[in-house]
Amino acid sequence: MKFTKNEARLRRKVRIRKKISGTAERPRLVVYRSNLHIYAQIVDDTTGSTLVATSTLSISRTQEGVHANKAGAELVGKEIARLAKDKDIQSVVFDRNGYLYHGRIKAVADGAREAGLEF
């Protein structure tokens, strides 16, 4: 039986999540990609709580013309890094959520690194 793209992504996601988890000292940066928006959140897996979250949806309320392209993804990365710095989070574990590390996912990671977040 052939898997769809999303089913293949979910299988990759399960394999990745077996290996990584976020702690209070080094939480997990999760990226989700939809057709219209890009979402990023920093999660502490020991307590199961979201520490910081942002998306192109929340950024587009304050800035005009932010979409789910590479430029918007880089803005999401910079914004999540800024919010993390405000909460004294210096380093994270990057969870690509089963997506290939390319394009918009890579742009989020590059934007976060550029803003000073360590992976």
UniProtKB/Swiss-Prot annotation:
CDD domains: Ribosomal_L18_L5e. GO terms for cellular component: cytosolic large ribosomal subunit. One of its GO terms (molecular function) is structural constituent of ribosome. Gene3D superfamilies: 3.30.420.100. Keywords: Ribonucleoprotein, Ribosomal protein, RNA-binding, rRNA-binding. Part of the 50S ribosomal subunit; part of the 5S rRNA/L5/L18/L25 subcomplex. Contacts the 5S and 23S rRNAs. This is one of the proteins that bind and probably mediate the attachment of the 5S RNA into the large ribosomal subunit, where it forms part of the central protuberance. This is Large ribosomal subunit protein uL18.
